[in-house]
Amino acid sequence: MSTTTQNIPWYRHLNRAQWRAFSAAWLGYLLDGFDFVLIALVLTEVQGEFGLTTVQAASLISAAFISRWFGGLMLGAMGDRYGRRLAMVTSIVLFSAGTLACGFAPGYITMFIARLVIGMGMAGEYGSSATYVIESWPKHLRNKASGFLISGFSVGAVVAAQVYSLVVPVWGWRALFFIGILPIIFALWLRKNIPEAEDWKEKHAGKAPVRTMVDILYRGEHRIANIVMTLAAATALWFCFAGNLQNAAIVAVLGLLCTAIFISFMVQSTGKRWPTGVMLMVVVLFAFLYSWPIQALLPTYLKTDLAYNPHTVANVLFFSGFGAAVGCCVGGFLGDWLGTRKAYVCSLLASQLLIIPVFAIGGANVWVLGLLLFFQQMLGQGIAGILPKLIGGYFDTDQRAAGLGFTYNVGALGGALAPIIGALIAQRLDLGTALASLSFSLTFVVILLIGLDMPSRVQRWLRPEALRTHDAIDGKPFSGAVPFGSAKNDLVKTKS
């Protein structure tokens, strides 16, 4: 950018159409967050009515993650072929319909299936909305676009917590799911009046339809085998997370089977760049493993371990959700200033100072707990607002929605594991200690994976001929694409 351009406030670089596009996508994310966290808020009520164990109840949270990989793949491919806008509308209809079905669920299995539908819609919303907004905004503002957008999910969670405190004590938990369907009408109207993403329009102007990941996997020469593997993965995940299997060895075998299937899909769809795709799935997996024990089980911790009433729970969750929302926006500014990966690492390191105190102080002082949660979530959870931008930079426009959707939502199975792992550890320790231990230890893994740019590094080690050296979204260099010695030599040459 020129000096004159840099002196203009960032928001003046955006026109009315770009703001309208962002507003529509942000509203979709708010609804997504509202619908998704409802189950966490009423988990104890559902558990009591259906007579579930703690692990079975936690699996209702996990259910939405089980179907996300397929929803991200299918709806992402729809976005790559037909445009980001159609994929967004389809996604929001899916997760809203699933939310309504939860309100009518007569038992555990029915609610589990409804949560699968929510997961598919949520996955499509993530991939299509993120690519839509990122591709609509100027390149130098795309961390802000990503962070601001993802803040909508946290705002939706805050709104859900406040509605929970007003609705559930009077009308019961089912009424909360009925409310989750109402905003869909306005969202659909808004989505019909927004422009298509600029990057997508430019890429597809006057050209034949692109060959999407769905075309490669389900219309190519290996389509029969891939359909069989898809059914096998769905069945394996069902048995792993529906709370029916007690044998850890069988669960481990099924988990390895799913891992092999997902890697096979990544190899087929990305070709020589499969090491990058696989490592991105690993990054997202650990990102969910460190963050989602708290996201999913914090309401349960507040109600059981701290014995808070619904009103107090809602107040504490307000601090938590609002902190995450603020953190998404702060992360956007940090990402555009420091660079995506450096901002991510710095924010996570700062969050580590707060995670132990959050669960060590107990529940005597609600305000202190709320403030600690606000800052911990701002730094630890909020920085995930720029994760779509980080992942999307490794994919070309033609496969960005499906690549982001599939990669992110396969890794998001960590979110399915997280509450169950937390619940299992809580059978031996108290829940607060379990949540703090998981989050503290696994955050360091994410710091290393992102800080060392392991997707580029592993690509360079295994398939260097397909190495991408610069971010496809903002054009900035990937640190892991260049050996340390070469990077130092290049710097010397540049200065001389």
Curated annotation (Swiss-Prot):
Superkingdom as given in the UniProt entry: Bacteria
Transport found in the keyword field: yes
Catalytic activity from the UniProt record: N-acetylneuraminate(in) + H(+)(in) = N-acetylneuraminate(out) + H(+)(out)
SUPFAM superfamilies hit by this protein: MFS general substrate transporter
Keywords: Cell inner membrane, Cell membrane, Membrane, Sugar transport, Transmembrane, Transmembrane helix, Transport
UniProt cross-references to Pfam families, sorted A to Z: MFS_1
One annotated Gene Ontology cellular component of this protein: plasma membrane
Membrane topology (UniProt): Multi-pass membrane protein
Chain ranges passing through the membrane: 22-42, 58-78, 92-112, 116-136, 148-168, 170-190, 224-244, 247-267, 278-298, 313-333, 353-375, 406-426, 431-451
GO molecular function, one term: carboxylic acid transmembrane transporter activity
Xref: InterPro entries: MFS, MFS_dom, MFS_trans_sf, SA_transporter
Free-text function comment from the UniProt entry: Catalyzes the proton-dependent transport of sialic acid.
Family listed: Belongs to the major facilitator superfamily. Sialate:H(+) symporter (SHS) (TC 2.A.1.12) family.
UniProt xrefs under PANTHER family: CARBOXYLIC ACID TRANSPORTER PROTEIN HOMOLOG (PTHR23508), SIALIC ACID TRANSPORTER NANT (PTHR23508:SF3)
Protein known as: Sialic acid transporter NanT
Annotated source species: Escherichia coli O157:H7
